[in-house]
Amino acid sequence: LPAADAESYPDAASMADLQFAVESGSAGEDMAIENGFNYTPVVDQATAVLEVSSGTCQAAIIDSLMAAAMVGEGTSYADLTYTINLNSEEYGVGFRKGSDLAAALNDFFAASWADGTMQTLADTYGVTAALIPQE
């Protein structure tokens, strides 16, 4: 939503009267339905952001990684921001049972977190908001 309006919408209840743009058939559309939001289905998440930028819709529901990369300072949509999470996103990597790759990947994640590489990459690609500390 427009960064200038962000403080007016601290939670889902405060957004009840907004018109949202959401990707048709997406988890975003599911969240719009679940929350009883008014929404316009669009072809993809990039179009949802464009709808907000053009003023056709007041807000969009998109993936948090997409939001972090597409809106805010240093992007084409510097006057937009993201605010609340309507659900959680979790990603996983799977390997064949008995493979030693899971342990190797876990070691890589721990080492790249410890030496700052993971943070540097997250900063570089605009996904810091989705970074999960490795312990």
Question: Which positions does each model-derived feature cover?
Answer:
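Short helix-initiation/N-cap motifs at beta->coil->alpha
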Residues: 7-8, 24-27, 40-54, 89
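Secondary-structure junction motif
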Residues: 10, 20-35
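Short helices/loops that flank or line small-molecule/ion binding pockets
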Residues: 13-16, 33-35, 46-61, 65-66, ...
